[in-house]
Amino acid sequence: TDSAYRLYAAKACGCDVRAYYVETSFQPEFEREDARRLAKELGADMKTLPLNILALDSVRNNPKDRCYYCKNAIFHEILKAAADDGFSCVMDGTNASDDAGDRPGMRALRELKVFSPLRLCGITKKALREYSRNAGLFTWDKPAYACLATRVPSGTFIDEEILARIEWAEGQLANLGFSDFRVRAAELPDPDANASRTPDPDASASGIPASGAPDSGVPHSGTSKRNWAARLQITKDQLPLLLEHQSQILELLKTRFSQVSLDLELRAPSR
């Protein structure tokens, strides 16, 4: 909603403007499709910039300030592309309802001198929805959406596999009529990790693990045989829908997650 209205306003004012969409594994397909649809409806030029965000250790290792490194990498790509295209100002969709404190993502925007006109003009999320509806933008009532990486707890290694599982699970729930919800993922212990095995005394004595593989001393990257639990966060008004489809949801999600549960601290509506 935020960036959509900012693009609309720039076009309405006759500005020479170009939209940039940085395509990473953190964005689901519907976000990409919405961006393309918006640009087409507004007659705006949009350039897609592919970025392998998980190539960055500071992102895939998922520290508490992951958002800083991610936002920094994304806007570095945008700033470079914008400069190459002859643009001198880069704007984002941060609004006055967003916390301007020392959040990691906000810190990256400040350091890179990215301009946030909606926030500087005091335009709130509520006002943006009203303005967007009056402008006829399809995004006016779109629920707030955070990237897929936010579904994984800080400190848990992020890989393509879990992002794909989360996107798939949220897509299944959306197909059942859910909106404004999250599927949170938590890694479970490997059920085979404690399996009994007979150690090889000779192998142990030689410094080779009983598995027969040499010990590289490198920590496990977290990319093989990972075991996950899914925790659903929905709004109170969607509880009847959940009960209606409980068996179907379990059957679907248990194909990708070992455990499926409901967060009883229900999600506050993001509208």
Annotate each PLM feature.
Residues 1-134, 192-196, 215-223, 230, ...:
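ATP-dependent adenylation/nucleotidyltransferase module used to activate substrates
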Residues 120-126, 155-167:
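Active-site glycine- and acidic-residue-rich loops that bind
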Residues 125-130, 137-146, 179-181:
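Short, structured loop/turn "capping" segments at alpha-beta junctions
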Residues 142-162:
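Internal, active-site/partner-interface "lid" segment
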Residues 160-183:
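Short amphipathic alpha-helix segments
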Residues 179-191, 224-231:
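Short edge beta-strands and adjacent turn/loop segments
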Residues 186-204:
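Long, compositionally biased low-complexity repeat segments characteristic
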Residues 227-244:
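A short interface-forming secondary-structure element
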